[in-house]
Regions:
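Short, small/polar-rich motifs associated with maturation and membrane association
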Residues: 1-397, 402, 409-411, 481-482
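Surface-exposed loop/interface segments of Gram-negative outer-membrane beta-barrel transport/assembly proteins
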Residues: 264-343, 384-391, 395-481, 497-499, ...
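A short, polar/charged loop-to-alpha-helix boundary motif
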Residues: 489
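Active-site and adjacent substrate-binding regions of carbohydrate-active enzymes
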Residues: 493
């Protein structure tokens, strides 16, 4: 049985196109460690060969997973390495999965060591899991507190800083791709800085938003493009009802908790990181190009003539019968000229390019037993898949924690983000798909032709916006996300915490469309100009009381949480 398998590590659709090739060029750390990471193995295609696919043989494998005592394990994750294809074991510890013959199975379960097993020629597997005490003692963020993995009963997946830094992306969410079972991540478009569509629990609603709730250091954040991936310590993904219930209806689609890096007592550490990545458009929609379009015109004329006299299959039109019959509208060339020269125009290819992303980060952290700090700065420049589309993002972060005494602890975080986006109109790519390829975008002197279609005078040249002064859309955004907290521990096991957050956003958008831009020429209007400014400010005040106590010889524990949250 053959099956078409496509592995895409970066989903980025540029108005119908997707970017699927991403690789690191170089990396630099404070220790002057330089590494070159090989290009990810992915399915891609060039502009002329849209249909390239990777075809591989698949087979069905079965297995039984047991623990160290020989008992079957329920709910063990079985994932095909590098993909989101996977399953979990049933009540008898068994699983069945369709996999490529050369696949590697990743077997994982909380509290046990992860195993990588090559499938090879085997069809049945007997797997014994080993407990991992170090993992069991790790803590994960759940709701308004933390819990050891050995005590965790809900469905929680963790992505650590090391996994995030391996992902060459301006958006940290893409580090979770293929690492969290059941998580689907797609980039909304190929524009620079485009958002990420995250689907954690499937499509629960046709009309409503299915995105999970995203929290940064316990506060609702929203856009993940504002966060520098290098500032993130860990991401916890809460999926089941027991883990997300505390967030009410906002957690109905799952919750992603992002914890940023904080200072640690000890020597001051300086880290410098840099990388360059490239996104390439692929899966470009097919259009009738060149002689295929001519063939379509011939077939259409033959069909029309057959209908006219009722004699089917007797008409055989010539190229001269279908080309040169259009109105032409005074164009400096004829369709026959294009046909004879073979100088057809691939409009989508003229609009697209490879997107280059550069990222640079510098962080300084350290402190004493009482006071710790973390300071970081980042700069990212991302090029979109359309020409003249570019986003520049600059981040600054400061976090300070101070232990006043054994009872009182205070701290603060400040995250500042500045974005400058020279944005392209998404409509031009769609317009390029219905342009006739039997046409030229420029005349013999290199001047752009406003309306190059020999059939429809209203069809504007989709390259018009590339001309200097024809189109300009600049969006400047500033965001300050500041949090302060006070924490009291009057007795052992009892923690009272109050947290206050201010989220201030300012956006300025300027838009100019010349009368000879694509949209204005298409609609026969004059030039258009707009200047918009928006300000947003949100306040969040959380108060929580946590009490944890052990009893019964430390075999049992009781956790009590009381709290209130106010948002304005």
């Amino acid at each position: 049985m053959e099956n078409v398998q496509k592995t895409r590590r970066l989903f980025a659709s540029a108005y119908g196109c997707k970017a699927s090739r991403s690789f690191l060029i170089w990396g630099l750390s404070a220790a002057m460690f330089i590494s070159v990471i090989p290009m990810m193995a992915e399915v891609s295609s060039d502009v002329r060969n849209f249909g390239t696919q990777l075809v591989t043989q698949v087979k069905s494998v079965t297995g039984t997973i047991i623990d160290e005592t020989g008992e079957p394990m329920i709910g063990v994750s079985v994932l095909v390495q590098g993909t989101t294809t996977g399953t979990v074991t049933d009540l008898d510890g068994k699983f069945v999965l369709e996999v490529p013959a050369n696949a590697t199975l990743v077997i994982s379960y909380i509290g046990y060591k992860t195993q990588n097993i090559k499938v090879g020629s085997q069809h049945a597997f007997a797997i014994k899991m080993e407990s991992d005490n170090e993992v069991l003692d790790e803590v994960v963020v759940v709701g308004y507190g933390v819990v050891k993995k050995r005590d965790l009963t809900g469905s929680v997946s963790s992505v650590k800083a090391g996994d995030i830094q391996k992902t060459a992306s301006s958006n940290a969410m893409q580090a979770m791709q293929a690492k969290v079972p059941g998580l689907d991540i797609q980039q909304s478009s190929g524009q620079a800085g485009s958002g990420i569509n995250i689907n954690l629990r499937g499509n629960r609603s046709i009309n409503a938003d299915n995105s999970p709730l995203i929290l940064v250091d316990g506060v609702e954040y929203g856009s993940t493009i504002d966060i520098n991936p290098s500032d993130i310590e860990s991401m916890e993904v809460l999926k089941d009802a027991s883990s997300t219930a505390i967030y009410g209806t906002k957690g109905a689609n799952g919750v992603i908790i992002i914890s940023t890096k904080r200072g640690k007592a000890g020597k001051t550490k300086v880290n410098l990181n840099a990388y360059v990545s490239v996104n390439e458009p692929t899966n470009i929609p097919k259009v009738m190009y060149g002689e295929r379009e001519v063939r379509r015109l011939l077939d259409a004329k033959n069909y029309k003539d057959d209908i006219a006299d009722g004699s089917w299959g007797t008409h055989h039109a010539k190229v001269e019968d279908v080309l040169g019959t259009a109105p032409n509208f005074g164009l400096p060339y004829s369709e026959m000229d294009v046909y004879n020269e073979g100088s057809y125009t691939d409009w989508p290819n003229l609009l697209l390019k490879n997107g280059l992303t550069q990222n640079y980060d510098l962080s300084i952290s350290g402190g004493s037993e009482k006071t710790t700090f973390n300071i970081s700065m980042g700069a990212m420049v991302e090029g979109g898949l359309l020409k003249n589309d570019k986003l520049a993002r600059y981040n600054g972060k400061l976090s300070v924690d101070h232990k006043v005494n054994d009872i009182l602890k205070v701290g603060m975080d400040m995250l500042y983000t500045h974005k400058n986006h020279d944005k392209r109109s998404g409509n031009v790519f769609g317009r390029s798909l219905y342009m006739s390829t039997i046409a030229h975008p420029y005349d013999a002197d290199g001047n752009i032709i406003l309306r190059p279609s020999p059939y429809y005078e209203a069809h504007a040249n989709p390259l018009l916006d590339d001309q200097e002064g024809a189109y300009d859309n600049n969006i400047v955004t500033n965001r300050l996300f500041a949090t302060s907290y006070l924490q009291l521990t009057p007795i052992k096991g009892l923690t009272l915490k109050t947290l206050f957050n201010v989220d201030y956003q300012q956006q300025h958008e300027g838009l100019y469309r010349d009368y000879q831009s694509v949209s204005e020429l298409q609609s026969a209007k004059g030039s258009y100009i707009s200047n918009d400014q928006n300000h947003y400010i949100n306040y969040t005040w959380d108060n929580t009381l946590n009490y944890i106590t052990d009893f019964g010889g430390s075999d049992h524990s009781l956790t009590l949480l009381l709290g209130s949250s106010t948002k304005r």
